[in-house]
Amino acid sequence: MDEILAKAGSQAVTFAIKSGISIASTYALKTITNFVVQIPKDDARRIDQLKFKLESRMAIVSSAIDLIKLVAARGNTNLQITLRLTKDLKEEIDRFDEKINEMTQKVEGSRSAKTQNEAIKAVENYIKDLLLRIEEITPFINLSLTTSGANLNSALPYQLSPGLLLKASDFVSENNRKYEKAMKSNEKGTGDKEILKVQVGPTFEVTLFSIFYNLTSENNGQSGIVWKEDMKRAKARIYRLNSTGRKYDYFMKIEQDFNDGRYHEDDDKEDTPQELAIDLNHIKKLFFSVSGKLLRLEEQDSPVLVLKIDRSDDKENESSEGDKGLLDDITWYAVSGYEAIEEDEEEDEEEDEEEGKDGEERKEEEEEENKLEDKDSSITLLEYIIRLTSLQSNDQKSILEVSDERLSIYLNDENTNSRKDRISNSTIEETEKKLKNLKL
């Protein structure tokens, strides 16, 4: 599915790229700074020099680890061995905080000069050992990146809209400020703390699709993959949620709107608006297609955003039988901007006239609600907000604090075939044929 969407000219970005160095290692470096204040000047000078060298090495190797993980996630099998090497190094760096704390506590909790000297020596040797490991693995990382042809270009892609990107960035930054303000107010309150959720940006009016598995076609030797319409009209909102252990945590809520020009039975309890919540941490890949026809959505010629959702990270002890289980964890959703049909609007007006006063009151309420709620139908703006909030969630820091290279990973298009002028009718027909014969 990933390959077909890429060949169909969809812009693509992989989100399964966590920051190479954990937040814990940053705190460990601060712990060393506090540690050197409590020890003799000669020892402090040596450890401070080692700390500076380690900090610079970690910053350099972090970018390389990010790039290796990104290229490997895109399907480069040549980097799998290097990925295992970097994984071991990253785990050692992640444990750095815990080990440094254990060693420094011996100095703080002991008055014995011998114990303090042993702790100082242990910290010094441990930092030297970690530096040696980084220096040993660096040539292999460089060689792997050179032979793979990968690069971490920080230039923005040509198809990126600067205006919409700035708008999305403003929405995310504004949400950061509102969230911090709400958290402070919540902390001042008495009793149980409320679960906070603060909306990011506007409400988007969308149409939601998901994959329908055609069992009849599967029995005939084909998967017959088909996109089915789940919600003709829906409201999509992105929220930042306070959670234990995570400063930045987001989810997208999609709520069906029955005011879609279709018949719905008000008295039928089973016929109620649907809701869908998607944890942004579960979005592993995002595709942006300039035309819904590439997905065999005949009535959707407008842009479509495709989300690959993988919930397997929530399962700690995954069985090795695994391939089927892993596939079951993957869900595909497609979102396009909702397009109102004029005929439906005219029919609604006629029905309101027939219903008289009740209809007018309901219409006035809907108009008032629309005025109060900031709405947008730009799928591209929604895409940029998802990219930026996913970056904050993965790195656990503000987009204003991340490096250009990290920002580039989440904004660049990894698909070289995504130019709009390359998409022809033959491309659409070829994609439709592949989707029809796709086996999942």
From Swiss-Prot:
Annotated TM spans: none
Record's function text: Important for the export of protein containing nuclear export signal (NES) out of the nucleus. Stimulates the GTPase activity of GSP1.
Stretches for region Disordered: 341-375
UniProt keywords, alphabetically: Cytoplasm, GTPase activation, Nucleus, Phosphoprotein, Protein transport, Transport
Residue intervals of the RanBD1 domain: 1-314
InterPro entries reported in the protein's UniProt record: Ran_GTP-bd-rel
The name this protein goes by in its record: Ran-specific GTPase-activating protein 30
GO molecular function, one term: GTPase regulator activity
Entry GO terms, CC: cytoplasm; nucleus
Subcellular localization(s) per the UniProt record: Cytoplasm; Nucleus
Alphabetical GO biological process terms: protein transport
Residues recorded with modification Phosphothreonine: 272
Bias type Acidic residues, positions: 341-371
Transport listed as a keyword: yes
Miscellaneous field: Present with 3670 molecules/cell in log phase SD medium.
PANTHER family named in the record: RAN-SPECIFIC GTPASE-ACTIVATING PROTEIN 30, RAN-SPECIFIC GTPASE-ACTIVATING PROTEIN 30-RELATED
Subunit record text: Interacts with GSP1.
